[in-house]
């Protein structure tokens, strides 16, 4: 009996003492309050990725479709651009939903970056990254307002539904962010990155 009690106590002490291994920060996530400049650079790289891929193929292709600049080949069931546009541009169609959702997914990432970067030490590098983030947010809203005219204006990260803003308010916000971007963007380094000259 004594051996069973000792074994039970030993097992319990091992289990209890090993619980602190779970109290460590995850290796694949960073608290918003402890983001370093190195972490910001990784998030910054993500902004370039999101800005390119989140609106989706449809987001970039919509302008060509609605402008009548794209025509299908001879084997198409749509004889002309207006027929195709009429069929594809319904509110329930993915050609409308996917870019809209993508623009706001991108906006969520941009706003998250801005909120974290504004709390960081304002080194030249951080200010330049903030300038690029403001540019991306202005570009995102430019795409939203030119395609949808009215949409929710999200200045901060939120998952709560927001009412639509007026077209004038959206354009004013685009201009506000472009002014911030002009004050902070880095000088030209390569054609692949946002710069003051671009």
For every predicted segment, state its role.
Residues 191-198:
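Amphipathic alpha-helical protein-interaction segments enriched in hydrophobic
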């Amino acid at each position: 009996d004594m051996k069973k009690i000792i074994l039970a106590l030993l097992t319990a002490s091992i289990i209890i003492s090993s619980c602190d291994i779970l109290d460590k920060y995850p290796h694949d996530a960073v608290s918003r309050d402890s983001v370093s400049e190195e972490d910001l650079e990784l998030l910054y790289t993500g902004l370039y990725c999101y800005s390119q891929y989140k609106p989706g193929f449809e987001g970039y292709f919509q302008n060509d479709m609605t402008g009548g600049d794209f025509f299908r080949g001879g084997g198409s069931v749509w004889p002309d651009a207006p027929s195709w546009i009429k069929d594809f541009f319904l509110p329930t169609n993915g050609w409308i939903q996917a870019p809209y959702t993508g623009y706001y997914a991108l906006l969520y990432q941009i706003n998250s970056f801005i909120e974290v970067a504004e709390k960081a030490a304002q080194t030249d590098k951080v200010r330049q990254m903030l300038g690029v983030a403001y540019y991306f947010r202005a570009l995102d809203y430019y795409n939203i307002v030119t395609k949808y005219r009215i949409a929710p204006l999200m200045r901060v990260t939120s998952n709560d539904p927001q009412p639509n803003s007026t077209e004038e308010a959206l354009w004013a916000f685009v201009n506000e962010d472009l002014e911030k971007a002009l004050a902070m963007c880095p000088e030209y380094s390569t054609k692949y990155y946002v710069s003051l000259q671009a």
